[in-house]
Amino acid sequence: EFENEYLGYLSTGQQQRVMIARALISNPELLILDEPASGLDYLARETLLEVLETLSHERPEITIIYVAHFIEEIIPIFDKIFILSKGMNFAQGKIDDVLTNKTMSSLFNRNVEVVNYKNRFSLHMIG
């Protein structure tokens, strides 16, 4: 889609998609994405996540490690989660087992409600 464009002229979201495509050329077994949605607006972030979902279905042999700071970026293709707090392992396991009100409230030291709507998560502070 962007083959005749200079990378510097593309939007941040387009650049992220190009970088993922470049990484896939070598047919990797592992794709590590460190905050790939950082700096993206809502639409670009959702487009990136859709690209990853498509990739997961088309290339199920690829393991994706996705590093994020926001729970909203967790999509159904991810089956496990590892939460760090202050550089230490805070919680890990299956997403439904870890993303609970109790665990997230403990993480933030506040009452938190985890909302799962159509397999997408969000957090709401209570009180």
Where do the model's predicted regions map?
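H-loop/switch region of ABC-family ATPase nucleotide-binding domains
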Residues: 68-69
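Conserved catalytic motifs of ABC-family nucleotide-binding domains
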Residues: 27
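ABC ATPase nucleotide-binding domains
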Residues: 107-127
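Helical segment within the ABC ATPase nucleotide-binding domain
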Residues: 46-59
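Conserved ABC ATPase signature
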Residues: 6-10
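Catalytic Walker B motif of ABC-type/P-loop ATPase nucleotide-binding domains
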Residues: 31-34
